[in-house]
Amino acid sequence: MMKSLLPRSMTLAALALLCSQAQAETLQTGKEVEAPTAKWEGVALGFEPPQPGLLGDMLGIRPILEDHGFHYNLGYLSQLSYNAGGGYNHDKQASYIDQFSLTFSQDLQALTGIPDAAIEGNIVNRNHDNNLTRDRLQDPRVGLTDLSQESFGGQSITRLGWLTFSRSFLDSRLQWRIGMMNKVQDFDQIIPCDFQTLTLCGGKSANSLTWYNWNVHYWGTTLQYKLTDGLTLKGGVMEQNPSAPSRSHAWSWSTKGSKGFLLPMEVELKTHAVNQLPGVYNLGVLFTNARQSDLYEGVSGGPGASDPQGYRSHDRTWFLYTGFNQQMTRHADDVNRGLSVFYSLGLGDQRSNYLHWSTSTGIRYRGLFDARPDDWLGLGVSVVKLSDRYKDNQRYLNEMSGISDYHDPNYRPVPGHSVTAELYYRVKVTPWLQLQPGLQYWHHPAGVSETQDAWVTALKTVVTF
């Protein structure tokens, strides 16, 4: 059991991380944080409106499409990371990944008369299997806690992120969506994905390891109901499918591999309560009945690694997430310039989730310099605490093998907590080109204190077509 169950659970957890928090810059159009009134603006919070693309109106084709209700956003994103010092493996390496993404919607209201009816879709092409975190920064004998390149997906692949139908009821206060969907269409979208490190990219709900972000689809249906212009209740039912990130599922309509269902619930508040400036807050919980393997306990009550019946499983697990994103200052001549602060927290069921809790906080400043009003400065830090059950299992495996030397390749490191920090400055070279150099600091990569702290230099490039 020791050799069959544990690696499989860790592989699934690592795969969930790799396919999770990667929300491309090209999706950050403010759609997910739309203003409850015309006065609420999320620009200073990191959600900028669409900018003119490199290809302009495409010889008049784009305006024709938009006149017929078809809107799209085509973008390119690349992320380069270099281990400047420290880490598990000190050999220098520059790791590069990139992706093309197409996000689109077709307005159906004019054709059908159904209020706010639309077809929405997302297609993502990812390239290269270059992962600096896996190859240099952390001990490969433990699970991932962060990624230096948040858009790393584990493979070069083109896949469907979502394809859904949506409409509204009750004078647009109730929105319904159904189809092959992704959580980023409805849930945990109060913090943008601008940092290059994974734990500082967006919220924490993907750390549940039971659903996936951005370019992985799964069947479901959701509802959003506006209690007031600023307060929204959200809920849904989705399939829990560990096979969803696989290559065979990239364009599949099948539910093959599904283990149960997910029940996400969230409340989101948009307000001007602080300094009469825009802010957005959320609190969410995610339940699933899909069986999850315990990280330590066996069916008979003792350690699962030596239990003849293997590790026990749980058919009811949960994940809690919350956060806020609040503008704190503004320039007298431009409300969209100023300082904003953010915070996010994810708390998992540590019986089955090796990421017990994770939290991030930081600041953004849009237009720090008068000569560069559209540039961004960002500084953030995140902490990940590993599950006690996971650590107990690692200790027990070492006891079974009689290995106590960390340098023995068969030793199982016992992780505690990891800390990652990032500083970036984003230069808006043109309306369609942004360059974002950054510096990352990794303390106890993957939570292993024996691994040397690491410094990473980074460069993110965003092109809008």
Task: Describe the role of every protein-language-model region.
Residues 2, 21-79, 109-113:
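N-terminal periplasmic/intermembrane-space "pro-region" immediately following the signal or transit peptide
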Residues 72-80, 119-125, 176-182, 233-239, ...:
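Transmembrane beta-barrel strands of outer-membrane/channel proteins
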Residues 453-465:
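Outer-membrane beta-barrel "beta-signal"
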